């Protein structure tokens, strides 16, 4: 099961490119994880966010009043607000959040933002229910060089003998 879950996580973060940039995906992942209170996901994803350039100030703003922060663009704020809306399940009552999102993102990007937040709502609950130990993976991610982000993500989920490159090579045959 780990390779399958790893595939989904890597795909939603980076491996399978869509129209949505990795920065926006990471903002959505971190905000969703914060709202769900999943210690494993918060620790791991804020560290990965740092590797992408997320500052401590931005992390704190995500926890607090990001809407009035000058640390995020209007598009960032719209994506964060939509993740919040999905996680807190008030999207049926809040049509303005979707309208704001569509001012900054096309339909494909809106779909990607929704998929990322939706998946991490599941993943946060799964990790909380399984009471995963954060120590080993978190320790590994704190030593992450931003240049090695993709290599790190691959190393988290596939066995050494069955790397993503190996899967890609087999698929090309």
Predicted ranges, named:
Residues 1-173:
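Hydrophobic alpha-helical segments
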């Amino acid at each position: 099961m780990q390779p399958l879950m790893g595939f989904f996580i890597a795909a939603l973060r980076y491996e399978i490119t869509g129209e949505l940039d990795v920065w926006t995906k990471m903002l959505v992942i971190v905000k969703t994880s914060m709202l769900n209170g999943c210690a494993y996901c918060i620790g791991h994803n804020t560290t990965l966010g740092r590797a992408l350039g997320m500052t401590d100030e931005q992390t704190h703003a995500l926890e607090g009043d990001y809407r009035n922060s000058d640390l995020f663009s209007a598009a960032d704020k719209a994506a964060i607000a939509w993740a919040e809306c999905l996680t807190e399940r008030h999207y049926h009552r809040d049509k303005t959040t979707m309208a704001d999102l569509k001012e900054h993102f096309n339909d494909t990007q809106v779909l990607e933002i929704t998929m990322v937040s939706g998946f991490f709502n599941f993943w946060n609950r799964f990790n909380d229910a399984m009471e995963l130990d954060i120590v080993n993976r978190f320790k590994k991610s704190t030593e992450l060089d931003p240049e090695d982000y993709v290599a790190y993500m691959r190393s988290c989920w596939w066995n050494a003998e069955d790397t993503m490159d190996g899967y890609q090579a087999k698929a090309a045959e």
